[in-house]
Amino acid sequence: EAVDLARRSDVVLFFFGLNEKSETEGLDRKHLRIPQNQINLIQELAKANANMIGIISAGSVIEMPWHHHFKALLHTALMGQAGAGAVLDILSGKVNPSGKLAETYIKKYEDTPSYNYYPSQERNSEYREGIYVGYRYFDTAGVPVNYPFGYGLSYTTFEYDNLQVKPD
């Protein structure tokens, strides 16, 4: 039904992400993927309509090997009851989506420095990467990512010209 509707539409708005079992306090996720049924639907919708916008509901990083299917992605974190209205305000241009990512969106979990020793059998979290936690690791090691820490767009463009610098 969704694929048929996508074929007949100008644009597809696809809301997806992690469910309440994946987004809970007090436990670690075993992987960084969204549910497989959502991945399958992304692939089928993309065949039906290439003009797709993805609206992600997730409180943490997810792998996105399918992100190329979307013309735009809007990460909404955990929206709450007013989330749909906020998304509508952004997509309609009423407000500027000026937020920036607070985490690095990696290509795959295996690219993280903790991959080889997680999960740990210890009771404490291990940060063997020292000061190179998060974006510092990816920047320093030159590991390609999907979207870096601080990434984000807004509805505007900037252009500089006729710049002048006065020497001191």
For the regions a protein language model found, what residue spans apply to each?
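Secreted, periplasmic, or luminal enzymes acting at the cell surface/secretory milieu
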Residues: S57-D168
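Hydrophobic helix-and-loop "lid/oligomerization" segment in the mid-to-C-terminal part
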Residues: E1-H69
